[in-house]
Amino acid sequence: MFKLKRLGLFPSLLTSVQVLGAEKLLPRARKSDSVQFLYYRALYEFHGQKFKEAWDRFKETWNLLHLQDWSHRRRVAVYMTAIAICHGKCPTRDFMMKYKLDGDLKTISDSILSGNSKLFKKELDNRADVLHNSLNIYVFLLLNAQPALQLNLVKRTWKLTGKSKIITFEQIRKVAECMNLMEITKDQLECILINLIGKVLY
């Protein structure tokens, strides 16, 4: 109950959760109540660094929202897009334009997917004022984008080398030099490759 009280949910929903429990509440609740409950639950998971759980809750919220409910769908889309791009995925351009995310997140997304750390920092700084209106998104990208940047740099190197089975440290270092990125140490490279196993050969 402490979690729900911190989220500031309205009394009727809080009382229902106390009496019935969340799993029994949602199937019989009004749709608007279910949407609000799932959205705040997603935010709680997001701020608790449980991004997989947050993604699932945001997705459930999204599926319950009316197709014409643009403002609420955009609010959810911002979080889902931020989580997606830090995991190497990117929404379509049409999706980002529809919810007006192309101005704030499209170039940031492109920089992460290309593994371009320098461009990412530049775009994040350029959009700091806008993203600070949603401070949690700014901090999330600042703290969680680096692993995705490094992973995508290795993917890019792998593709440039003709998708060979072996990627050498020298190949990755050369790509980093060409892109004017910070030097990658052997320890960093080892961590990147460990995270890369099973994620590139698709």
What annotation goes with each model-predicted range?
Residues T15-L25, K59-H66:
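Amphipathic alpha-helical segments of tetratricopeptide repeats
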Residues G21, L25-S34, A42:
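Conserved binding/catalytic microenvironments
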